[in-house]
A protein has these predicted regions:
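Domain-level recognition of nuclease-like catalytic cores that cleave nucleotide substrates
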Residues: 192-251
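Short aromatic-glycine-enriched beta-strand elements
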Residues: 16-21
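Short nucleic-acid-contacting surface segments enriched for D/E, G, S/T with interspersed K/R
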Residues: 38-51
Length: 251
């Protein structure tokens, strides 16, 4: 995906979760929308260089959106919702390799009693009507996308960056789908150029770490994609290793 021209600025503070005060090069102080629900640990240091996109809607209350921040470890896209767009493009281009060969891709698919997957991949070779996950079958793969911005150690990214009951529930639902005969995958989309491998954030959310391990043990596929990121574009360019999927594995 490509970015329109971004405005450079200096971060003053991030607050109330969705707001960020930023100073522009001309000295103006603006309030930007911060499209990230996480803790943004290491990605919200005052004084950091940031990049903002202008709002397309002139009636929007906040005229700017915080897109990226420069950290000592690398450039980070903090607009976490863009991970879905990046992954959709990657899937269409054949990443991850083990998810190649699907006939159709559909976003935001409901399954089970009240669950929703980011994507469903249909590996059936013949069109069979609307792509609706009525019951689990191996030819229908649910895909859950998780944006990774937290770097815990040199090159090691971790998810989540705050306790997430919702993310834990997602893993349990994917595990249930697989146990019923379906196929499911979680893709960690790494939006930080300094990260070269990913692990569950055991010390932050042990419940999620355990849910991920249990899901993996029962057949949920786990992948990570690293991006090439600049102020002009962001594209998933490579698969990264996922560690910590077995007890005691944190390499």
């Amino acid at each position: 995906m490509r970015f329109d021209t971004l405005q450079q600025g200096t971060l003053i503070r991030r607050y109330k979760r969705f707001l960020a005060d930023v100073t522009l090069p001309n000295g103006d102080l603006v309030v930007a929308h911060c499209p990230n629900t996480g803790a943004m640990t290491g990605c919200a240091e005052p004084g950091s260089t940031v990049f903002l996109s202008p709002a397309n809607n002139p009636k929007r209350k906040l005229a700017w959106t915080l897109e990226m921040i420069e950290t000592p470890q690398g450039l980070v896209c903090v607009h976490s919702a863009l991970a879905n767009k990046v992954v959709a493009e990657a899937l269409e281009k054949g990443l991850p390799l083990d998810l190649q060969g699907f006939a159709r891709l559909k976003p935001e698919v409901k399954y089970g009693a009240s669950s929703r997957a980011d994507f469903m991949l249909d590996f059936r070779r013949e069109a069979v009507g609307p792509l609706i996950a009525v019951q689990p079958i191996p030819e229908l793969a649910l895909v859950e996308v998780k944006a990774v911005t937290l770097q815990q150690a040199s090159g090691l990214g971790a998810f989540p960056d705050a306790v997430s009951v919702r993310a834990t529930r997602h893993m349990e639902e994917l595990r249930g789908w697989v146990l019923q005969g379906g196929r499911a995958a979680v893709i960690f989309c790494v939006l930080h150029t300094g990260i070269n491998r990913v692990a569950p954030a055991e010390t932050i959310d042990p419940n999620y770490a355990q849910a991920l391990r249990s899901a993996f043990a029962d057949g949920v596929e786990v992948y990570a994609l690293g991006v090439d990121l600049s102020v002009d574009a962001m594209v998933a360019a490579r698969e990264l290793p996922v560690v910590g999927l077995a007890e005691g594995d944190s390499s």
